[in-house]
Each structure stands twice: as C-alpha cells, then as structure tokens.
C-alpha cells in the first residue's frame, strides 16, 4: 500500500489482501494488473506501467518493510501452544512464505524469541515459483525427509495457501479468524455484531472450500483434532 501511495497511485487494503500469499514481487505485479490501478497509473504518468515500475515499487516495498518487519513478528494466539502439542506427537513443522530469505532472516529470530519456531522454513528464492505452485512444500519435504505427500498437511490463511496445498496434493486446511481472507484485527472481531461476524466467516469458509480446502477451521487450536481425523481416515484406507 505504502509503495503505491508514494507515487500517487493508491491501492486499497482489500486490493492488497486479494493477492496475499504470493511472492511479494508477484503481489505487486498483480496490483498493477488491476484495471483501476493500471488506468490511474497511465493517467498520471502518460504511459502504461512496465516491469521497471514493478521493480521500483518492489524496491520501495522492501525499504518500508525492512524498517518495521521485526515489529510484526508476534505469534497469533494459540500458535505456540498448538505447535508444541503437535511436536509432542512427533509432527515436524515446515513453513512456506512469500517473503524472501533476507526478510525471513529478520522474522525468524524475532519470532523464535517470542516462542514461535519451525523445524524448517522455505522461501521462494531459487525455486521455479512461489505460491500457489507446490515447490516450497516439496522443498520442505526434502529438507525434512518426508517420504510421501500423504504425510503432509498444509495449513494457511490465504487462498494462495490453499491452492499451494492442493497443487502439492497435500491435505489442506484453511483458517478463518486472524486470516488475511477475513481481514479483521482482533479488536475488530471483538467489536463486530455477532451476525455480521458469522456472515463474514461463512464467506471466507466458502471461498476456501471452493479453492479446494479439505477442512476449514476457526482457529489453529482446532488443528490437532483435524489431524486426528485425517489419521483415522488414513488407517481405513
């Protein structure tokens, strides 16, 4: 949002959220592909936006991001406890992200200091593509010596996450509360009328299921029960 505002072509939070989960440079390309944004850029600069404009906005995005990245590393409520419970079952935790390795070199130590640590983190660097392609999941499998995708569960809060899991042929679970797709901070969730909140949650659930999710949960605290159900299904097969 800030990188586009800097050139007088503002994008909305909703437009930005619609492309979350992709690599950051792909998010910027997607924003330039929005008809309104494309038209506003041409009106302001008298020419169509090109790849040099994508790279310029990406450079500005990185400048703004690195200045504040460490401030946005607080774990979502329930994440630390759930990961601990899953590890107690022998489950390994691999992460995929739209951030670059240099960005994650800032995020991971700060998150670890707050109790959130993964066994492996894969970024799009050096891979054919980021989300929704499955390569980061496959790289996690190789790094963690996971022999079969049947043993993999992809959990995420964006449509790109869901598509990544489905493209990898992995069990795929979407989360609603705190998600990019819901787009509400905890304070906003608490202040919304119950019927409006339920309607918004239902819309996110519908979109995630339409994208292929096998399960959609309200919070990560429900994940161990989902895994137990999947394990029962696998025992029957």
Located regions from the model:
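Asp-based, Mg2+/Mn2+-dependent phosphohydrolase catalytic module
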Residues: 80, 84-88, 100-237
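N-terminal helical cap/lid subdomain that shapes the substrate entry/recognition surface
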Residues: 1-80, 84-89, 105
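A structural preference for short, hydrophobic beta-strand core positions in alpha/beta folds
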Residues: 13, 95, 216-218
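Structural motif
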Residues: 19, 96-98
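Glycine- and other small-residue-rich loops at beta-strand/loop junctions that grip anionic moieties
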Residues: 72, 96, 129
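A general marker of short, structured functional hotspots
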Residues: 54-57, 95, 134, 151
């Amino acid at each position: 949002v800030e990188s586009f505002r800097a050139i007088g072509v503002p994008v909305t939070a909703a437009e930005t959220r619609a492309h979350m989960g992709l690599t950051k440079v792909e998010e910027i390309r997607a924003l330039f592909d929005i008809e309104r944004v494309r038209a506003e850029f041409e009106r302001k600069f008298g020419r169509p936006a090109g790849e040099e404009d994508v790279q310029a906005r990406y450079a500005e995005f990185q400048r703004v991001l690195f200045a504040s990245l460490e401030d946005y590393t607080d774990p979502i409520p329930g994440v630390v406890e759930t990961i601990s419970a899953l590890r107690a079952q022998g489950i390994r935790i691999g992460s995929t992200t739209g951030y670059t390795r240099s960005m994650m070199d800032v995020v991971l130590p700060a998150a670890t200091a707050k109790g959130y640590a993964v066994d492996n983190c894969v970024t799009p660097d050096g891979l054919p593509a980021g989300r929704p392609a499955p390569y980061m999941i496959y790289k996690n499998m190789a790094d963690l010596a996971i022999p079969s995708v049947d043993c993999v569960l992809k959990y995420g809060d964006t449509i790109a996450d869901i598509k990544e899991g489905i493209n990898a042929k992995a069990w795929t679970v979407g989360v609603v509360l705190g998600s990019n797709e819901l787009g509400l901070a905890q304070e906003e969730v608490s202040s919304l009328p119950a019927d409006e909140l339920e309607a918004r949650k239902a819309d996110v659930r519908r979109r995630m299921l339409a994208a292929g999710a096998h399960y959609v949960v309200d919070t990560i605290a429900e994940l161990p029960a989902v895994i137990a159900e999947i394990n029962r299904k696998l025992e029957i097969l």
